Amino acid sequence: MMTPMWISLFKVLLLLFAFFATYEAKEYERIIKELFTITNDEGVVLFNTSADSAPFMPIPTQHDDPTQKQKQNQNQSPIPETNRHYHQYHSLIQPDQYFKVQRSPNGKLNLVFNDTFVSLQRTDTEVQSEQPIPPRHPSDTFVFPDSPIAKYRPPQSPARPLRNDTKEHNPCAKDESQHLRNFCTNVDDYPDLSGLTHKLKNNFAKFFSNDLQPTDVSSRVGGSDERFLCRSIRKLVYPKKGLRADDTWQLIVNNDEYKQAIQIEECEGADQPCDFAANFPQSYNPICKQHYTQQTLASIKSDGELDVVQNSFKIPSCCKCALKTG
């Protein structure tokens, strides 16, 4: 059973409900009109000032609009037409000041305070227009035969000379017919060594005193009952350029007056199977390998002034059959 206190509270609530239920509808309408501006136009207008003098503010166009500038020149006090499909929001500061957020047809939001146009968002076109324009090169444009650009030719850097110590794929002369793996008997732009005659004669005479005799250039074979598993060729060469021990190319002193002869032996089929490979066990893979030795030669300095120095070069010495397992 309800206590007297709850009964009294319930009666008060009933009286309040009856009071609000019987409140005249026109009183609600009067209050709403004081707080909001009621219009039948399309769009929404919120938080307008309650003063009777507060106008329904139109939305001005952007200041950089050429059409708007032309209208302002013709009439100093233009009244822009209202774009009714924009959403406008007014402030509650005072009757002659207002703050609006408007959405343009392209979806961009804008701020307007006392007819001052402030953009909140930038369209894609505006963002693209602010991007720096890359510099144009003659290759990026159409060039007509009579244009000055067609007559312009950018300066070209001179071709690099053949360096002494580069790992070039073809360090020898272009017309070299017998290019060896480690030496060139003919090179382009070989220097004139006449200025080094005194130094070559006094300091490097030992390099030009050897008198090697050419040997048989046929494949190495022993007696009638001997045969090597890898075929090779012996040569006596006078190289003008060679591969050093550090795998860089360098010019070698070799001309009509000062000659350095070296004897080399190269594999006919380097990294190829040895002869009689089928007779080896299946677990072994016989391969012909080129072996090298080092020999010191009088060479031309790689950089700086023309000079003679000593350097070690890789000399192909023999061809051996090596067994690989697996």
From Swiss-Prot:
UniProt keyword Glycoprotein, yes or no: yes
S-S bridge residues: 230-288, 267-319, 274-321
Start-end of Polar residues biased regions: 69-80
GO biological process: antifungal innate immune response; cell competition in a multicellular organism; central nervous system formation; defense response to fungus; defense response to Gram-negative bacterium; defense response to Gram-positive bacterium; dorsal/ventral axis specification; dorsal/ventral pattern formation
UniProt-listed InterPro entries: Cystine-knot_cytokine, Spaetzle, Spz/Toll_ligand-like
PTM field: During the immune response, cleaved in the same manner by SPE. Extracellular forms of isoform 8.19 and isoform 11.7 are glycosylated.
Position of the signal peptide: 1-25
Any one GO MF annotation of this record: protein homodimerization activity
UniProt feature, compositional bias: Basic and acidic residues: 162-174
Effect of residue 318 to S/T: Reduced phenotypic rescue of a mutant
Site (Cleavage): 220-221
One term under GO cellular component: extracellular space
Miscellaneous section: 'Spaetzle' means 'noodles' in German.
Function: Binding to Toll activates the Toll signaling pathway and induces expression of the antifungal peptide drosomycin. Component of the extracellular signaling pathway that establishes dorsal-ventral polarity in the embryo.
Protein name: Protein spaetzle
